[in-house]
């Protein structure tokens, strides 16, 4: 490709509304342009990267035995009503009616569509297992699209769905997809972790996220410093402390705390160690409970894990925090004065709270706290559960080492769905015993557009993007200095351009009438891994300057050796 025949829409300045580095560089490198909130046009440079990501995904899906299909973006509402997700999915599901007043949705995912297809196409266990995938545009009406294509409303996704007659068969496919995902992200040159995860709104039994490690990530990735244990923050278990509860050394006293409505204020004003404080959160109780609310207690320096809390049998799903009005009507005190002593609703405490002694908590009286509270002396020990987020330094749940926490960008997610959708949509086949058998399902997603942004978040410097070779828009940049004035530079540039292309190498030759500084800046900005610079001074010695984008190292290569050198560098 020649720049004179190409749309190289680079920008010198960073757009003001671009928050994260990937969004900034994708705009500056001429990869994308914003059409509307959360909607982007992919320009040629960006599309080349996107297609390379897509091709790697497709190759590994094929290698794993998945079968490619293509399903409609527009889906009839009755399928979503049949599955129960019409009400559950919320405002991210874009709903509309056609001219006949028939309701439809723009598909954010395709569990319903593929299950409907399978229930009409398959009849016998002999046809299974099967695993179908597509790479297709999805739409989710995000309330606040942000970070460019990282959290856009329209995006390209690879979604796959497998069907089985046994858990053992599902596990085999799940393991194969786990391995395929690991190959995909390894081929792309990404630093990633596969972590255990909660199944969330998709539902099901088991789940893993694939997280690209990056400071700009929205997720906390938890892993051991001494083993392969890895999980996301929602799933990671906070191990119960091994040390027994210390004996009480203080009497419980009622203290006036009129200006301490938060743990931070309590600690500061009364010089308390935060590890000796407890915070109390009230949430809605499950429907049918004899109490409207449930009290959840975590140590003052810990955070409630809402996913874990929602799974408690006493707690309503989705987890809903009580309003101040609801709290005052029941407890007769505000949210800043709550504690376990004389709490009129069921209490669940975190494992760490269970081993605390001589601690401080609200007295359920406005402007007052109890200091020196001890379990079983001042208040009975309530139900104990793991309801907090882990913190760095916690022991690893597998007993090996301690936990580290890094930020991550979720680029893939695999689920063992079980029979959630097949039961709802009555997808079954005749089993080996001749009886009707509900199918067991798995689903496997990769955010193809998100992978592009995640790769940039991991691969950039002060000059621009530093693409991993496998997904770079071009493999080689040819920069002929003053080619429009030097016949030999122009002649050699054309010769090398043709020879490299004949070797199957993707080349961008900058044949613009631009200053060398502009040419260098643009090629470094868009991140082409290998650059050769042709100039009269070096050609006097039969040399060509080669530069590797990742480390910036330069070397002189003889003109007769440059093609073989590049072929070896790229193809090995």
Curated annotation (Swiss-Prot):
UniProt superkingdom: Bacteria
Record carries keyword Lyase: no
CDD domains xrefs: ProRS-INS, ProRS_anticodon_short, ProRS_core_prok
Subcellular location: Cytoplasm
One of the record's GO cellular component terms: cytosol
Catalytic activity: tRNA(Pro) + L-proline + ATP = L-prolyl-tRNA(Pro) + AMP + diphosphate
GO molecular function: aminoacyl-tRNA deacylase activity; ATP binding; proline-tRNA ligase activity
A GO biological-process term: prolyl-tRNA aminoacylation
Endoplasmic reticulum listed as a keyword: no
Signal peptide: none
Predominant cellular place of this UniProt entry's protein: cytoplasm
Keywords for this protein: Aminoacyl-tRNA synthetase, ATP-binding, Cytoplasm, Ligase, Nucleotide-binding, Protein biosynthesis
SUPFAM superfamilies linked: Class II aaRS ABD-related, Class II aaRS and biotin synthetases, YbaK/ProRS associated domain
PROSITE patterns (alphabetical): AA_TRNA_LIGASE_II
Enzyme class: ligase
Listed InterPro entries: aa-tRNA-synt_IIb (IPR002314), aa-tRNA-synth_II (IPR006195), aa-tRNA-synth_II/BPL/LPL (IPR045864), Anticodon-bd (IPR004154), Anticodon-bd_dom_sf (IPR036621), Pro-tRNA-ligase_IIa (IPR002316), Pro-tRNA-synth_IIa_bac-type (IPR004500), Pro-tRNA-Synthase_IIa_type1 (IPR023717)
Database matches in Pfam families: HGTP_anticodon, tRNA-synt_2b, tRNA_edit
The EC number(s) this enzyme carries: 6.1.1.15
Family (UniProt): Belongs to the class-II aminoacyl-tRNA synthetase family. ProS type 1 subfamily.
PANTHER family, sorted: MITOCHONDRIAL RIBOSOME PROTEIN L39/PROLYL-TRNA LIGASE FAMILY MEMBER, PROLINE--TRNA LIGASE
Subunit note: Homodimer.
Domain notes: Consists of three domains: the N-terminal catalytic domain, the editing domain and the C-terminal anticodon-binding domain.
Protein's job: Catalyzes the attachment of proline to tRNA(Pro) in a two-step reaction: proline is first activated by ATP to form Pro-AMP and then transferred to the acceptor end of tRNA(Pro). As ProRS can inadvertently accommodate and process non-cognate amino acids such as alanine and cysteine, to avoid such errors it has two additional distinct editing activities against alanine. One activity is designated as 'pretransfer' editing and involves the tRNA(Pro)-independent hydrolysis of activated Ala-AMP.
Name used for this protein in its record: Proline--tRNA ligase
Provenance organism: Citrobacter koseri (strain ATCC BAA-895 / CDC 4225-83 / SGSC4696)
Gene from which this protein is expressed: proS
């Amino acid at each position: 490709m020649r720049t004179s025949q190409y749309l190289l829409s680079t920008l010198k300045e960073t757009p003001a509304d671009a928050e994260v580095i990937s969004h900034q560089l994708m705009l500056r490198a001429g990869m994308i342009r914003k059409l509307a909130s959360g909607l982007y046009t992919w320009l040629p440079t960006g599309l080349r990267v996107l297609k390379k990501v897509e091709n790697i995904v497709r190759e590994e899906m094929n290698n794993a035995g998945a079968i490619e299909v293509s399903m409609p973006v527009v889906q009839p509402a009755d399928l979503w009503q049949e599955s129960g997700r019409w009400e559950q999915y919320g405002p991210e599901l874009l709903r509309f009616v056609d001219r006949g007043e028939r309701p439809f949705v723009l598909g954010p995912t395709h569990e319903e569509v593929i299950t409907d297809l399978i229930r009409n196409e398959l009849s016998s266990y002999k046809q299974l297992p099967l695993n179908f995938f597509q790479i297709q545009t999805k739409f989710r009406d995000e309330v606040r699209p942000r970070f460019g294509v990282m959290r856009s409303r329209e995006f390209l996704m690879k979604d796959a769905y497998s069907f089985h007659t046994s858990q053992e068969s599902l596990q085999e496919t799940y393991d194969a997809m786990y391995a395929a995902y690991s190959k995909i992200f390894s081929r792309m040159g990404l630093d990633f972790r596969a972590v255990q995860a909660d199944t969330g709104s998709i539902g099901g039994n088991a789940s893993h996220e694939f997280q690209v490690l990056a400071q700009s990530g929205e997720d906390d990735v938890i892993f051991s410093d001494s083993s392969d244990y890895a999980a996301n923050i929602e799933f990671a278990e906070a191990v119960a402390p091994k040390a027994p509860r210390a004996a009480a050394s203080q009497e419980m006293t009622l203290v006036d705390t009129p200006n301490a409505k938060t743990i931070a204020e309590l600690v500061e004003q009364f010089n308390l160690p935060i590890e000796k404080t407890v915070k109390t959160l009230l949430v809605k109780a499950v429907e049918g409970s004899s109490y409207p609310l449930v009290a959840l207690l975590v140590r003052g320096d810990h955070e409630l894990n809402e996913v874990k809390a929602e799974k408690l049998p006493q707690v309503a799903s989705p987890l809903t925090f009580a309003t101040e009005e609801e709290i005052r009507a029941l407890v007769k005190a505000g949210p800043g004065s709550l504690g376990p002593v004389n709490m009129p609703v069921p209490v669940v405490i975190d494992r760490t709270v269970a081993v605390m002694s001589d601690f401080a908590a609200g007295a359920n009286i406005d402007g007052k706290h109890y200091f020196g509270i001890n379990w079983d002396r001042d208040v009975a020990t309530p139900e104990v559960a793991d309801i907090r987020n882990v913190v760095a330094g916690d022991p690893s749940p597998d007993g090996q080492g301690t936990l580290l926490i890094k930020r991550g960008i979720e680029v893939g997610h695999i689920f063992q769905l079980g029979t959630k959708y097949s039961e709802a949509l009555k997808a079954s086949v005749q089993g080996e015993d001749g009886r009707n058998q509900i199918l067991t399902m798995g689903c496997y997603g990769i955010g193809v557009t998100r992978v592009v942004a995640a790769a940039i978040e991991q691969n950039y410097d002060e000059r621009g993007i530093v693409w991993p070779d496998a997904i770079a828009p071009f493999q080689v940049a040819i920069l002929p200095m003053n080619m429009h004035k030097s016949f030999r530079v122009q002649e050699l540039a054309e010769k090398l351009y043709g020879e490299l292309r004949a070797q199957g190498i993707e080349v961008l030759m900058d044949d613009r009438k631009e200053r060398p500084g502009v040419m260098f800046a643009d090629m470094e900005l868009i991140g082409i891994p290998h650059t050769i610079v042709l100039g009269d001074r070096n050609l006097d010695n039969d040399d060509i300057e080669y530069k590797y984008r990742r480390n910036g190292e330069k070397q002189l290569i003889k003109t007769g050796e440059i093609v073989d050198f590049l072929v070896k560098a790229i193809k090995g």
